[in-house]
From Swiss-Prot:
GO cellular component, one term: nucleus
Xref: Pfam families: Cyclin_N, CycT2-like_C
Record's compositionally biased regions (Basic and acidic residues): 460-470, 508-543
Compositionally biased spans, kind Polar residues: 276-299, 379-392, 399-408, 485-501
InterPro entries per record: Cyclin-like_dom, Cyclin-like_sf, Cyclin/Ssn8, Cyclin_N
Entry keyword set: Cell cycle, Cell division, Cyclin
Protein name, UniProt field: Cyclin-T1-4
Gene: CYCT1-1
A Gene Ontology molecular function term of the record: cyclin-dependent protein serine/threonine kinase activator activity
Domain of life the protein comes from: Eukaryota
Family per record: Belongs to the cyclin family. Cyclin T subfamily.
Start and end residues of each stretch annotated as Disordered: 1-27, 276-330, 343-408, 460-543
Amino acid sequence: MAMMPSDSSHHGIVENSPYRTTQGRNEETGELGASWYFSRKEIEENSPSRRDGIDLKKESYLRKSYCTFLQDLGMRLKVPQVTIATAIVFCHRFYLRQSHAKNDRRTIATVCMFLAGKVEETPRPLKDVILVSYEIIHKKDPAAGQRIKQKEVYDQQKELILLAERVVLATLGFDLNVHHPYKPLVEAIRKFKVAQNALAQVAWNFVNDGLRTSLCLQFKPHHIAAGAIFLAAKFLKVKLPSDGEKVWWQEFDVTPRQLEEVSNQMLELYEQNCAAQAQPSHGNEAEGSSASVPNQRVSVKSEETPLPHQSKQSSSQHSTGAPSHHGVEHSNLEKQTVDQKMLQNDNGDHGSNKTRSNQSGSRVDFGANDGLHHDKQSMTENKNLPSHGNSSEIRDVNRNGNDGTNVTSLMVNKIDKDKVKAQMEKQRKLKGDVARKVEVIDDDDDLERQLEHDIELAVEDNKIKQERKQSSPHVMHRGDHRNADQVTGNGHLGKQNTPETAQDAPMDDIKEQRNSHGSKHHDSHDTAHERGERDYKRPRPEG
């Protein structure tokens, strides 16, 4: 929660803040403004927050918290990434000399963003910074956006930010000079001429993720840039060039020990993220990777050997796309992708028929309804049957005489799913619902319900036909068509034009046979001629 003038934490900033005594002590030793670089041990053990009962784990959480807050604030204010990085460095330096227990991190972060905008010549109005910051701080309160627009609330918040700005400037000793690893990183990659775009992007992401740690308080910008390039090359499996006896990392004036430490601290961030997500810990593996970094660095020619914790770009970083997953997970994902492609190749056309894509990119999956897919061979055998009338009309052409065995598969074969979907879209447009965007799963459900409705109608029609056939004593199975002889106009039997199978017979003839329903064999030829159809006589079964 943001500090208000009446809060005790607010008074702690000015009255109880240790920055005055800290300033005096540092001025005596000549520390203030002279150097912002300390060892990791000094930062972790001598932190002012530690003296106020905040342990290392809690402080690490608070550090990541205000980094995330600044990233979100910077994106909403539409400032460059360099401005966001400067604000984060200001915060790190502030809490190097101030305690989290006495200074609200989000108020200090808001001030640092306001200062960073002016330092990097990308200023944002104080009013905009206050409004956006207040909305982020109270994002769970729907009324916060309207409350901050009230004059009394806004004036209180403005007074708080301006007061905190003076505290931040005094704590930093008015030293607002900040250098980032971005410039040396880009300049070095330009010289490599190897996968420049990909290498620069991944290394840039590692630098952005490194801002969430205390690396900027331990190492100079070009050292951090070297570590980011090293990890990016391992992640992309790119071999960095060397000029004779001089290897690439010597361009950064970095020692092997420094390169190792920078790389390992960057990797620790991803290990902590995995642990926070309740995933299996890889602590032992991480220790092994730490020990192996110097050897891999010295023999940098063998860079084809990846680190155990190569990182993958994270979807959680909106503007940076920073890596956040280990190489093990990345390799498993690749393996699953390959297996899926192999499975699709094995399935052939059958697999492609299960999923269809429309022009909008929506996927309609019919594979989930196993009841709609029976014997694929029966569908193939009947694919040459001519279609008449409605595309969803089902005709009994089952050779084995089991009337209902392949009815469902034939229904799916006959029903034109694209036409059904087109009809559904047409109905939506008629209702004035053109602008409405439908989710993929809703579209799938609507289409499946329409298909099921058509199938139910077809099944009912088929049942009616079956009942009529069973009520007739002269019903023929399809296999009996093989021995059926055509009745000519004068009553004589002939086999010249008799189809051998039901597939060879015109569909109108088959339909006429079904609609006869046991009609008398002495129907006149003239009556059949008036209907424009030929009449077949069904011989009585022998024996």
